[in-house]
Amino acid sequence: MAAPKGNRFWEARSSHGRNPKFESPEALWAACCEYFEWVEANPLWEMKAFSYQGEVIQEPIAKMRAMTITGLTLFIDVTLETWRTYRLREDLSEVVTRAEQVIYDQKFSGAAADLLNANIIARDLGLKEQSQVEDVTPDKGDRDKRRSRIKELFNRGTGRDS
């Protein structure tokens, strides 16, 4: 049954739209801390084979679980888009920054201690080794001559003129 035309029932609502998931920075930080505690309390498990007195036994070994922004947003039940919006909100941006720093530090420290795969974490954190190659050829004119000679030989081999 539809509402009668011209009704103004919507004015009787105490608020419009759904209530925000986190109404304060403290509530968001508390939810983030719950995620951090959950990650620490729930490591990943790997089965390792050990040999003792000729008998092979398998034992579960706890492995560090890497914190992620995706894991955090799933845990606190918000989308990545909402998380990015929180980053822009004046009241929540400090909490978002702090949470992202905790996640970065946990990953970096875990990789440095060889508790997490350093290659995967380095890529995730945007870390890379850089080397810079500098041309130290003393006479740049010689380089240009070599280039034009190489181009000439290449073109002769392919049958092109230029």
From Swiss-Prot:
The keyword DNA-binding applies. Keywords: DNA-binding, Late protein, Viral genome packaging, Viral release from host cell. Residues 143-152 bind DNA. GO terms for cellular component: viral terminase complex; viral terminase, small subunit. Residues 137-162 have a biased composition (Basic and acidic residues). Gene3D superfamilies: 1.10.132.80. Pfam families: GP3_package (PF16677). One of its GO terms (molecular function) is DNA binding. Residues 140-162 are annotated as: Interaction with the terminase large subunit gp2. The keyword DNA-binding applies. Residues 132-162 are annotated as: Disordered. Residues 7-27 are annotated as: Helix-turn-helix (HTH). InterPro entries: GP3_package. Homononamer; forms a ring-like structure through which genomic DNA is translocated into the capsid. Interacts with the terminase small subunit; the active complex is composed of dimer of terminase large subunits and a nonamer ring of terminase small subunits. Belongs to the P22likvirus small terminase family. The N-terminus contains a helix-turn-helix (HTH) doamin that is involved in viral DNA binding. The terminase small subunit binds to the packaging initiation site and regulates the ATPase activity of the terminase large subunit. The terminase lies at a unique vertex of the procapsid and is composed of two subunits, a small terminase subunit involved in viral DNA recognition (packaging 'pac' sequence), and a large terminase subunit possessing endonucleolytic and ATPase activities. Both terminase subunits heterooligomerize and are docked on the portal protein to form the packaging machine. This is Terminase, small subunit. It comes from Salmonella phage P22. The gene is 3.
